[in-house]
């Protein structure tokens, strides 16, 4: 990962996607992205590289990394277009194979030129995740209706976090839902989270996510808690 257009180009993305395809025994790969402006271009390039190499693509659209990781286990592989909590101009590829992140040997395969099979062109499918329903069953219903404020930070947790919390019985308010209007940066651990701090003074708890939804900061009684 790195600054898009400088450290990471579309040529790099195409190369890495094609090379990754040789590791996919299932011939199926889940794709998801966070909300970075460069995400759409990179996603389409990843799809092209995989499908050209005979891999069927299962597109989750914008989704948090934990959701995409779980779906990747079902299909055998996944590529998540994100640079996590890094600055907006950054982007990257998180790759999942057989339910795990890539190891050193697999990374070497991805970086170095490969000759993937071109026996057929892969197909593209739009998919949705059962993550919210499954997680809600595990958590169960919360009886006392806690008041929760969720600071999306303009990221991929937008729909997933609020829907899950509401499903288990929380009274949910969301702030910074839209990427273009977010009052803070992509990393909640380094931000003051002033809007969330103010908002949670009369609520039970606040949660702040990073752009790909795998990093969380908690605010209680108007005070940011160190992770």
Residue ranges of predicted features:
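Flexible, glycine- and charge-enriched loops at secondary-structure boundaries
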Residues: 6, 10, 100, 186, ...
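Loop/helix-junction capping segments adjacent to catalytic residues or to phosphate/diphosphate-binding pockets
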Residues: 10, 39-40, 66, 155-159
């Amino acid at each position: 990962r790195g600054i898009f257009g400088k450290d990471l180009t579309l040529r790099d993305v195409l190369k890495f996607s094609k090379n990754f395809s040789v590791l996919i025994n299932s011939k199926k790969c889940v794709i998801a992205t966070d909300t970075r402006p460069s995400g759409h271009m990179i996603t389409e390039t990843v799809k092209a590289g995989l499908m050209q190499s005979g891999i069927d693509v299962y597109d989750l659209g914008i989704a948090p990394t934990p959701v995409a990781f779980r779906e990747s286990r079902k299909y055998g592989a996944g590529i998540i277009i994100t640079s996590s909590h890094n600055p907006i101009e950054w982007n990257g590829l998180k790759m999942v194979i057989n339910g795990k992140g890539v190891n050193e040997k697999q990374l070497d395969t991805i970086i170095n030129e490969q000759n993937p099979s071109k026996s057929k062109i892969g197909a593209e499918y739009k998919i949705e995740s059962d993550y919210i329903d499954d997680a809600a069953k595990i958590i169960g219903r919360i009886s006392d209706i806690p008041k929760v404020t969720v600071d999306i930070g303009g990221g991929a947790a937008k729909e997933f976090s609020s829907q899950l919390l509401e499903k288990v019985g929380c009274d949910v308010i969301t702030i910074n839902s839209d990427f273009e209007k977010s009052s803070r940066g992509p990393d909640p651990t380094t931000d003051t989270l002033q809007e969330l701090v103010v908002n949670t003074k009369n609520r039970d708890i606040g949660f702040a996510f990073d752009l790909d939804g795998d990093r969380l900061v908690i605010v209680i009684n108007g005070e940011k808690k160190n992770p």
